[in-house]
């Protein structure tokens, strides 16, 4: 072997090794599937669960989540600033902020502005609201109008600061966005508000998880929640239950969606293992 051949072989070997160890850029194209990898996030309360279950600090739990392939965190309102900083230091971008403004009771301007400021100060452009509740499962047309009007007011304020306002199909029969019919009505009444598609929350009679696909044009974020067979309220790792997660994610990507997918399994007693399994399943799609 001459010197030139040896140099060429060395360069090839170095490039091959670099390709193996170089981390994938967030928006890099997966040349096997021809698509960018999914942007996966986790709820901040799930990180807290991991810390408690594993007996480690929040920062250590966030690092474990990042190692599992998660790159974002959906922050619940009230999370301490030092924990948000720890998550960001671990490499988790703030994907969304979730707030509970209780619009059925009134419009707290300071609280609403603080929610938006929390997002802006952490480089986040989405706030999801659980806007309010009816007194019971019965619909209340007058209260619906009040909650919608205050949600639109919030959305107008947030938009001036570059933040989108979102609502999800919420799994509480007292919610004005429970089920596909109520969610559609709410979004029609609030055209400036985006939709968070929670794959595990379409549980009303006659509904299927795919019901939300008709709202795909309004989707700005996804909560990927799976359900165990025979338990419409249970929690399990994404991909291990009966919800057609792969089909829904594929439909979203085919429609051009390239935003965040927050994995969700509230109540899991083995949260880190669920996170790892969910991330592995989703990365393989």
For the regions a language model picked out, list residue spans one by one:
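N-terminal pre-domain/capping segments
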Residues: 20-125, 194, 283-284
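Structural preference for beta-strand elements that scaffold enzyme active sites
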Residues: 37-41, 72, 93-96, 125-128, ...
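Active-site beta-loop-alpha junctions enriched in small/polar residues
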Residues: 43-47, 76-78, 99-103, 132-134, ...
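Conserved, mostly hydrophobic/aromatic
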Residues: 65, 87, 119, 165, ...
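Alpha-helix-loop-beta-strand connector modules within alpha/beta enzyme cores
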Residues: 86-101, 148-158, 186-190, 245-248
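Acidic/histidine-rich catalytic cores of soluble enzymes
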Residues: 97, 156-242
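Active-site groove signature of glycoside hydrolases
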Residues: 121-140, 161-172, 262-263
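C-terminal helical cap(s) of enzyme catalytic domains, especially alpha/beta-barrels
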Residues: 271-285
